[in-house]
């Protein structure tokens, strides 16, 4: 036996039904769709969720609650350990300085400082939001926080 003698098992390969390719094919003319009617037309399938004219489930069930997603504030997040990288270069840390120094790529809806890590020296920080732990750590080394 050679590789060119190998054939698939009988009945394992089914030939594709090529419809609408002439009368000699056996599937020409009406292309297995029957005669007239909605199902024989192009785009003739009923929509997903169509229940024969009965009010669909999606419209029978009442709406509940609300979504506040469009008004959600998404802050650019910076930890205290990240502030240590530029603490020697600047006295006042603002969202704009962090953007210039490349610590923040996009300010989004503002800047929020979180308390991961320790701060080396006292600084003044201007930010849109700050966590309690970050506030305590900055104030413990004699720094000031201004919420803008």
From Swiss-Prot:
One of its GO terms (cellular component) is cytosolic large ribosomal subunit. Residues 1-61 are annotated as: Disordered. Keywords: Ribonucleoprotein, Ribosomal protein, RNA-binding, rRNA-binding. Coiled coil: none annotated. SUPFAM superfamilies: Ribosomal proteins L15p and L18e. It comes from the Bacteria. One of its GO terms (molecular function) is rRNA binding. InterPro entries: Ribosomal_uL15, Ribosomal_uL15/eL18, Ribosomal_uL15/eL18_sf, Ribosomal_uL15_bac-type, Ribosomal_uL15_CS. One of its GO terms (biological process) is translation. Part of the 50S ribosomal subunit. Belongs to the universal ribosomal protein uL15 family. Binds to the 23S rRNA. This is Large ribosomal subunit protein uL15.
């Amino acid at each position: 036996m050679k590789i060119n003698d190998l054939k698939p098992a009988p009945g394992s390969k089914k030939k594709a039904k090529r419809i609408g390719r002439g009368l000699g094919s056996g599937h020409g003319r009406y292309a297995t769709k029957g005669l007239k009617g909605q199902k024989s037309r192009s785009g003739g399938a009923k929509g997903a969720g169509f229940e024969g004219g009965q009010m669909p489930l999606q419209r029978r069930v009442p709406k509940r609650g609300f979504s506040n997603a469009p008004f959600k504030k998404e802050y650019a997040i910076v930890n205290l350990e990240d502030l240590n990288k530029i603490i020697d270069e600047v006295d006042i840390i603002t969202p704009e300085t962090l953007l210039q120094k490349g610590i923040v790529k996009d300010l989004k809806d503002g800047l929020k400082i979180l308390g991961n890590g320790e701060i080396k020296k006292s600084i003044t920080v201007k930010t849109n939001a700050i966590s309690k732990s970050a506030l305590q750590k900055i104030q413990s080394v004699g720094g000031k926080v201004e919420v803008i």
